[in-house]
Amino acid sequence: MKPAALLVLVSAAFAQQPQPAPHAGYVYPAGGRQGTTFEVTVGGQALNGVNNVYLSGPGVHVSIIEYERPMTPAEANTLREQAQELNKKRQANPGAFPAADMQKLLEIRDKLAKFVRRPMNAAIAETVRIGVTVDPGAAPGSRELRLATPNGMTNPLAFQIGTLPEWTRATAEAISAPGVARPAQQRNITPSTAATAPIDVTLPVVINGQIMPGAIDRYRFAAAKGQRLVAIANARELIPYISDAVPGWFQAALALRDSAGKEVDYADHYSFHPDPVLYYEIPADGQYTIEIHDSIYRGREDFVYRIQLGELPFVTGIFPLGGKAGARTAVEVKGWNLPSPRLAETGKAKGVELVSPANSNAVPFAVDTLPEALEKEPNDRTQNAQKLKLPVIVNGRINRPGDQDVFRFDAKAGDEIVAEVMARRLDSPLDSILRLTDGKGKELAVNDDTEDKSAALLTHHADSRIMLKLPAKGTYYLFLADAQHKGGPDYAYRLRVSHPQPDFELRVTPSGINARSGATIPVAVHAIRRDGFDGEIAVKLKDAPAGF
């Protein structure tokens, strides 16, 4: 990626003094079921005057119930003095204490309780309560929620619409102990020794909760022998980045216990994704308990989670990982509780689409315009290398640990070639390594990892890429393997071998701007240049509002 260009947006009218930008740190619960009405709380900063809620997609209706800012110490002292006076009055004449005074005393106690339980992080100290109604036909999936204030809109938060019954734990503000400081990072935190009893839930269910320091949230349910239980935790999926939490997000861990309290399964991740997924075939009828906690027992209001729990469909892998645009591709599907091991997918346009067989989790499916081919075994040596006609995208697998796939192609002197693997970016566990040699075995290029700045949430950019001008006419060999010598049916890949296809993508930061009248607003436009594209890029506002 070349340095970002600075685009300056100027809105008409007079300049005003800049105000703090509104910020949303979390929404809880972070979703709800079709056909239900419920309340959510948004925690953030500079939310005073909030006047609207924007939720992407149709079928969901929202309204603001209440804005609440954190109380100052001086205001708390005033309330304490008022409470003392009311208590004196009550003690002096208990039998004749007016009902209105009792109500006022209870309200003061509630406000003081909120004061001592307030978040220690100013970035989530203000709250907005919102009413949400989801139409029965609202499309399930993830949406974006933002708040609008006189000073602009907040950053977006993930908000999920589901089809399963939901159970929501009381907000952390209502259940945490008075006087407890709650930074996201705390030293020497250990699990709570006074854990509450498990909460009973009925499968299938989506469980909403917030993890506090040292807490382990427990949920008990009845399960029958032979049930194929799936527990899917969403944590980083909801809030990808928490600035003062290491490694930068809520790292959830799941544990499953039987009726005797024995741990029978555990997960603190799924494949290379930080959010854990647990699969367990129930061996006997009984009561089971699912537990969730932070991996190092941190916690705070913005450690929000959703657990999908039940005999649910879950896709663990597909093959091939993509297909040609406009063509019908037969896809093998692997996973749990799936009605069919196959589906047919027709890619619409070049890019990456999401497919969700049988209302399961969504998995990426790459679509391209180049010819497609399947890897043909055996092809693990130069002697049986699979011949390629360029350009082509090969769909293959590293079938076993230590396996490698070898391909050969013919080229002329001066030909420029690109060999690029797409695997990790398509949810494959493959950590590819790619090697190019000439016909005599001389190594011309090798690559393990290539960073793709368009895949920002990947913690390991494991896909390989080689771009090289070939020195002579002849036959060339590509060797593709797993850098960790792993392999298996899930280790799928797409290997593009072609001449360069120069192109670019743009990303704009920040994700939203707040433009007051007369203000000059800088935004950064990042150019992701593909296959050596080095041309100029003209940037302009599309459908710009009047005055910009």
List the predicted regions and their residue ranges.
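Acidic, Ser/Thr/Pro-rich low-complexity intrinsically disordered segments
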Residues: 19-90, 99, 161, 200-360, ...
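Extended, compositionally biased low-complexity polar/Lys-Gly-rich tracts
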Residues: 122-139, 143-147, 187-210, 253-256, ...
